[in-house]
Amino acid sequence: MKIVHLVLSESFAGIEQHVDEVLTNFSSHKLILICNESIASYFDKRINIYKVKNFGRRSFFGKYKLKKLIKDIDPDIVHTHGSKTSSIISSIKTKNYKHVATIHGVKKNKKIYEKADLIIGVSDKALEGINHETICINNWWHPKLKKIQNKNNKYALAVGRLEKVKGFDLLIASWKNICANLVIIGSGKERNKLNELIEQNNLSEKVKIIDAVKKEELLNYYQDASVLIISSRDEGGPRVALE
């Protein structure tokens, strides 16, 4: 069976790591990844990857090229991750393949997923309110990550996409009265706003934002942290907490 996983994120975070682990640990089928060229280098080198330029869910040209690429690959299943990819595939799908969609968080608008043949949720909460065939597969803990033993803890750590849902603005604003350093690791469209918030609150000596790093480097940050903070406004099944 030939399965295409579709990820059109602009940054490599929890969803993308989830897909990377699926593709590198399930060898019984022919697995293929279509992703934005900006994040392709973060995935395991053994994965068969087709790179595409980033495009919006309403881009006629972007959807036309994607539809042609999928037709050339000729998969049995297209597995989408996130609302953007699910919406796009629902609008271009043919009868030649099945559409499986995974919901990785708590979403307000779940109707866009209901055109898929099967919906997977990372938690029961993520699947609430969906009137369709669903299955819950909880996020997992990767066995290669070792228990942290470092006692020389240096800072508080937060990890995730720099988007409003992750609540980093709330975390930064609350840090004014805390006498400790905070490291936020991630990339995304809220970066400039968060940096401005750090400056406005005179926190540049205590709070630092670091671009998304690869898994091996992220483990070093975990080992040097005294505490992990999850400030999300909503979470379906936080991988960072499992790590």
Protein language model regions, located:
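Donor nucleotide-sugar binding/catalytic pocket of nucleotide-sugar-dependent glycosyltransferases
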Residues: 115-146
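Short alpha-helical donor nucleotide-sugar binding micro-motif in glycosyltransferases
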Residues: 70, 212-213, 220-225
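Conserved donor-binding/catalytic core segment of Leloir-type glycosyltransferases
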Residues: 4, 141, 148-166, 172-179, ...
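N-terminal strand-loop element at the rim of the active site
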Residues: 5-62, 69
